[in-house]
Every structure is written in C-alpha cells, then in structure tokens.
C-alpha cells in the first residue's frame, strides 16, 4: 500500500518532498 511505498523513501527525499509541499502551501497562502 501507500504506507509501504512511503517507508521505502529515504529520509532525505521525504524531507525534500516535505519542503516542496511547504513551499506550495506558502505560495497559495500569498496568492
């Protein structure tokens, strides 16, 4: 399932993706 897929992602990549989602939220908040 999705949880197993996420567990297979290295921590640095999870942090990278989290940074992207945070940036997208920040952009939407400014619009």
Swiss-Prot record:
Signal peptide, first to last residue: none
Pfam families per UniProt: Antimicrobial14 (PF08109)
Any one GO BP annotation for this protein: defense response to bacterium
InterPro entries to which the protein is assigned, alphabetical: Antimicrobial14
Keywords: Antibiotic, Antimicrobial, Bacteriocin
Highest taxon of source: Bacteria
Function text: Antibacterial activity against several lactic acid bacteria, Listeria, Streptococci, etc.
Protein name as annotated: Bacteriocin lactocin-705
